[in-house]
């Protein structure tokens, strides 16, 4: 049975565990930039570590940092934060981080994949913990600048110092996360629920449901442009209502016809067979089979992923959406 999560806010946390520590943020993409800026603006000492000079290097310089090569940033650091892509982390750790680890250093992750599936196995004399913002980097930064914060998950994998949770919460606070709330979890729970959510709903399930509805309408003779609005474009408005006001708030905002159709037909579309398949997908993640499959796929150059992206780029859904973009943008209110 599920238990009630422990949630920490600003009043429960302090920046003290991170004060005076040299923090190396590895990567300067969406999350890396937001983390580096927020931590620095919270008064912490931040260095950006990058593999090579390029756009990210120049962006970091433009933002007032003096970026270093990854290994140089790690050599000087007390805290190393991994914000490079998941599948690049193992190589970065092995070649750029592991040779320079010292007792008492901290390794920080924003997603548990590499630790949970043992792609990275740190020595026992360092702290290993996670701070995972539940939003994309630009939102993490925007909310922070405006005085708010994106909720975060925090977890501890190794607690050599005895203070790993306090340090995780200090970073969460510096990111702005405890302005909303930091939810305590585990690497296992964060990794598995993140992957299950992505596959069954956020990327896989929702996209395939939209495609199936769109293609069904087109096959029945309806115009692709009309089908696109009804099955794809309007989803954002419904999700925004749920995000802002919950399911009941959304239901109060739609017509009685929509409510009745949703309650009666929705359960026919998402039925027990669908739930069985959801459980199968979840078990594949929990067992580690998905991770094994993805690691093998990545090692072969990601042919399945490349094929999927190519097919989507050429799909009628995507082509219709591009044609309608001008109409959609023309009607968007000017800020």
From Swiss-Prot:
Pfam families: KARI_C, KARI_N. It catalyses: (2R)-2,3-dihydroxy-3-methylbutanoate + NAD(+) = (2S)-2-acetolactate + NADH + H(+); (2R)-2,3-dihydroxy-3-methylbutanoate + NADP(+) = (2S)-2-acetolactate + NADPH + H(+). Residues 308-335 have a biased composition (Basic and acidic residues). Coiled coil: none annotated. Its cofactor is Mg(2+). Mg(2+) 2 binds at residues 194, 230, 234. Belongs to the ketol-acid reductoisomerase family. This is Ketol-acid reductoisomerase (NAD(P)(+)). The gene is ilvC.
